[in-house]
């Protein structure tokens, strides 16, 4: 059940806060300001610029979805396309529906796979921009990680492919919006709801640890809700893989959510940091959801050395009205010393404040969330669609025509080297090294491999059936058995 505190105050969307925080990466520390604690009379902290922001128009998701379904019905007399199973997935396999978001160097839109009519989110990243911003390595690392993992509380990768301009990732479509969006809409999250998010993230982080992965960017912006209100972790762009006994050392993450040991390692050297940093970030996120601002007043302009000093001198202030159980849980997550911090699923399961949690039910999404996003709305900024249609110099919906023109232009050019040899070399390297991935095909392959071999009676039956059928049906389906080269 939703508590009254978790209902929006009005039908009009609240003014948006400033853009989501930037991230510190191994090559730098470009991060956004934290939310400073407001005066006691203020109901909720706002990012800088709120006073100038205009209310967002509501996007009527239910009406749009109905219109799309009617469009499908009107063209439903035509058969679904059937793609050759031996063919690699590509841009033509998807119908672009609308833009829903953008990141530092990529954009996201809703797509529908033409043959199955399943809906996904598709993130696409311009190759040239990635090269110019030195982001290619991060994209490849994210793909490497996402192709190897799958979990109920992660945003899972289904397909990856490329064309001359862009790299594409097709992932789970979650229509409930991210937690940053709901903070900006002034949603008042109850303790029960925040506790559920903490537990769902605990299951996700426990799985990532089993795969030797540190996410390094857990924050409200990267936690998406599904239509039922369950939390899913996304964006592995600065995640890292560490083997047994190894430690990470790079300054990477979003400053207000980065654990103290990351700054300490950067300033003083030492042994580095490990999986505990993600659990600190969960604590910061939970505190922010409950109070409206973060436990430490950290800005992008803060020197790393000053942050090391801050964590040793400033203590977190907890609201007296919060329950003792919630305060105890937050204290364990926000412990400065990583050795004493909650940093494993076992720690959580043995915590007195979580003794009532049914972890098996939780992992199967049987626990009903306290906050359920409004199903009649698309929980994103509708101006993304306008930007894509009007301001974008290379809009996605005109890609086929643009690529056809480029091919025609390229064929008529002189074969001499272009002036930008370096850029072309980088583009060629991406084209060669990019790994195409198809989880749908991989799952079919695994299902076929797991089927038990037929017994003698079954074998006889199969043979007689095959003899009575047309010859093509007796042939082995090589395309459905053999996954693409990127599926392993």
Swiss-Prot record:
It holds the Pfam family Pkinase. Residues 1-56, 397-420, 443-488 are annotated as: Disordered. Residues 24-33 have a biased composition (Low complexity). InterPro entries: Kinase-like_dom_sf, Prot_kinase_dom, Protein_kinase_ATP_BS, Ser/Thr_kinase_AS. CDD domains: STKc_Yank1. This is Serine/threonine-protein kinase 32C. Its EC number is 2.7.11.1. It catalyses: L-seryl-[protein] + ATP = O-phospho-L-seryl-[protein] + ADP + H(+); L-threonyl-[protein] + ATP = O-phospho-L-threonyl-[protein] + ADP + H(+). Residues 397-406 have a biased composition (Basic residues). It comes from the Eukaryota.
């Amino acid at each position: 059940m939703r508590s009254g505190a978790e209902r929006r105050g009005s039908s009009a969307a609240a003014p948006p806060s400033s853009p989501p925080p930037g991230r510190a990466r191994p090559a730098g520390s470009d991060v956004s300001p934290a939310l400073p604690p407001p005066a006691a009379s203020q109901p909720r902290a706002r990012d800088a610029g709120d006073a100038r922001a205009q209310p967002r128009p509501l996007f009527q998701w239910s009406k749009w979805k109905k219109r799309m379904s009617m469009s499908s019905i009107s063209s439903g007399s035509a058969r679904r396309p059937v793609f050759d199973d031996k063919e690699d997935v590509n841009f033509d396999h998807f119908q672009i529906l609308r833009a829903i978001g953008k990141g530092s160097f990529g954009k996201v839109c809703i797509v529908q796979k033409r043959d199955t009519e399943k809906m996904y989110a598709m993130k696409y990243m311009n190759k040239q921009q990635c090269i110019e911003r030195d982001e290619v390595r991060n994209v490849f690392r994210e793909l490497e990680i996402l192709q190897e993992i799958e979990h109920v509380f992660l945003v899972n990768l289904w397909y990856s492919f490329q064309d001359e301009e862009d790299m594409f990732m097709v992932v789970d479509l979650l229509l409930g919006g991210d937690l940053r969006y709901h903070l900006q809409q002034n949603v008042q999250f109850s303790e029960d709801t925040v506790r559920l998010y903490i537990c769902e993230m605990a299951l996700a982080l426990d799985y990532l640890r089993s795969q030797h992965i540190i996410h390094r960017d857990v924050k409200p912006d990267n936690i998406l809700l599904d239509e039922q209100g369950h939390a899913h972790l996304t964006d592995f762009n600065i995640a890292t893989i560490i083997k047994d006994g190894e430690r990470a050392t790079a300054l990477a993450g979003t400053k207000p959510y980065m654990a103290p040991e990351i700054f300490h390692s950067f300033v003083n050297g030492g042994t580095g940091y490990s999986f505990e940093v993600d659990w600190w970030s969960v604590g910061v996120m939970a505190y922010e959801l409950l109070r409206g601002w973060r436990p430490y007043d950290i800005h992008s302009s803060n020197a790393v050395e000053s942050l090391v000093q801050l964590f040793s001198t400033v203590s977190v202030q907890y609201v007296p009205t919060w329950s003792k159980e919630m305060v105890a849980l937050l204290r364990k997550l926000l412990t400065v010393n990583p050795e004493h911090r909650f940093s494993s699923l076992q720690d959580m399961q043995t915590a007195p404040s979580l003794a009532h949690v049914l972890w098996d039910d939780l992992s199967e999404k049987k626990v009903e969330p306290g906050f359920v996003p409004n199903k009649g709305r698309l929980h994103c900024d509708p101006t993304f669609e306008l930007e894509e249609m009007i301001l974008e110099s290379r809009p996605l919906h005109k890609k086929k025509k643009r690529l056809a023109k480029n091919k025609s232009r390229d064929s008529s050019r002189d074969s001499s080297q272009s002036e930008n040899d370096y850029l072309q070399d980088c583009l060629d390297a991406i084209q060669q090294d990019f790994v195409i991935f198809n989880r749908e095909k991989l799952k079919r392959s695994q299902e076929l491999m797991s089927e038990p071999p037929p017994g003698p009676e079954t074998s006889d039956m199969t043979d007689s059936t095959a003899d009575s059928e047309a010859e093509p049906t007796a042939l082995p389906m090589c395309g459905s058995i053999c996954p693409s080269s990127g599926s392993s």
